[in-house]
């Protein structure tokens, strides 16, 4: 089968691969739409997870069931399905402990374009299909369905990590597609003030449409000074991080008030260490909590988030700026995510 792969760090291209084999608990999916992600960029061009050779990229997509294993009862050939980017082994010890995303070890639920081939192919494999697939609601837009793989659940998970509650004031760093979904999630949870920190004026109106109340351009002013000024020098109760370099954590701690929480879903793709400012962290005793996590994936989460779209409580289409028609446009869509032109938020390829 034809597939688009990471050839090695810094290089991608089209290759031929065998069709994946379906085990008794698995499913083989023919993609209907896929979406490149900034994580693919970190993996290929920053070497974020180390060297990979001829590994098929892609962890965001939806499709139609082409084959199911003998133990799969809830899905049949021809079903249109949603697929999460994170596909845990749901009978694992870590899943039973409440951390399915780490089944089999740290980040073990992240399989696509990490430890196995991803979705940018004519067919892709899904393990533990009963737990990792969900039926696509009738009439759902395919591009919206792709956003359920990663952008929506990851953005919403930032809110869970920071324990967003009614009326809180929070700051949000990096309003890319995951960030916009984090903003939407915070608004749905009832956050009272949502301060967006980014450098792209074009994104402000979209961020406001999802619930942002204030905007800071970090290229024009000091983020720390501005947030402290706006909060009477107290800082915000919560900080959500979905992007940025290794220093962004330092800024987050500086603007967080004592007792506050940071919810990080950012993939730090480069550097060996992340630094914490000693004084602003209360020399270790400020009760400023840093909570970073990988979203959990799974059928139940997919079904719940799909319900928000179908009842029009969430509209991910606002952030899809580039739509391509045809499998052959995967490379073009990926390089858009790498080059980040000013008008880009998210690209999607519909087959």
From Swiss-Prot:
Q: What is this protein called?
A: Probable NADP-dependent isopropanol dehydrogenase
Which SUPFAM superfamilies does the record associate with it? GroES-like, NAD(P)-binding Rossmann-fold domains
User: PROSITE patterns under this entry?
Assistant: ADH_ZINC (PS00059)
Q: Record-annotated residues binding Zn(2+)? A: 37, 59-60, 150
Q: Kindly list the cofactors needed.
A: Zn(2+)
What this protein catalyses is: propan-2-ol + NADP(+) = acetone + NADPH + H(+)
Coiled-coil segments on the chain, per record = none
Q: Where does NADP(+) bind?
A: 175-178, 198-200, 265-267, 340
Q: Which UniProt keywords apply?
A: Metal-binding, NADP, Oxidoreductase, Zinc
Listed GO molecular functions? isopropanol dehydrogenase (NADP+) activity; zinc ion binding
């Amino acid at each position: 089968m034809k597939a688009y792969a990471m050839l090695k760090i810094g290089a991608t291209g089209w290759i031929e691969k065998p069709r994946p084999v379906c085990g008794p608990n698995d499913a083989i999916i023919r993609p209907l739409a896929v979406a490149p992600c900034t994580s693919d960029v970190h993996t290929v061009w920053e070497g974020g997870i180390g060297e990979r050779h001829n590994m098929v990229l892609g962890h965001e997509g939806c499709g139609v069931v082409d084959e199911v294993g003998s133990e799969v009862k809830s899905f049949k050939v021809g079903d249109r399905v949603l697929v999460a980017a994170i596909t845990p082994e749901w009978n694992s010890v870590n899943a039973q402990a409440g951390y399915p995303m780490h089944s089999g070890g740290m980040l073990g639920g992240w399989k696509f374009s990490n430890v196995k081939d991803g979705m940018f192919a004519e067919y892709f494999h899904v393990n533990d299909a009963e737990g990792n697939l969900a039926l696509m609601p009738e009439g759902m837009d395919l591009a919206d369905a792709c956003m359920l793989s990663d952008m929506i659940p990851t953005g919403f998970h930032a809110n869970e990590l920071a324990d967003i509650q009614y009326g809180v004031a929070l700051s949000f760093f990096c309003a890319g597609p995951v960030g916009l979904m984090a903003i939407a999630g915070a608004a749905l949870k009832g956050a009272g003030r949502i301060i967006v920190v980014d450098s792209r004026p074009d994104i402000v109106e979209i961020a406001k449409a999802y619930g942002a109340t204030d905007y800071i351009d970090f290229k024009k002013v000091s983020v720390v000074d501005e947030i402290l000024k706006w909060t009477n020098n107290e800082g915000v109760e919560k900080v959500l991080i979905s992007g940025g370099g290794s220093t962004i954590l330092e800024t987050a701690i500086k603007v967080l008030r004592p007792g506050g929480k940071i919810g990080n879903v950012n993939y730090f793709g480069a550097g060996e260490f992340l630094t914490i400012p000693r004084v602003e962290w209360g020399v270790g005793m400020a009760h400023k909590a840093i909570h970073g996590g990988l979203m959990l994936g799974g059928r139940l989460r997919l079904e719940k988030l799909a319900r928000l779209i179908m009842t029009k409580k969430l509209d991910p289409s606002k952030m899809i700026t580039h739509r391509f028609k045809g499998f052959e446009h995967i490379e073009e869509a990926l390089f858009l995510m790498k080059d980040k032109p000013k008008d880009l938020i998210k690209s999607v390829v519909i087959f």
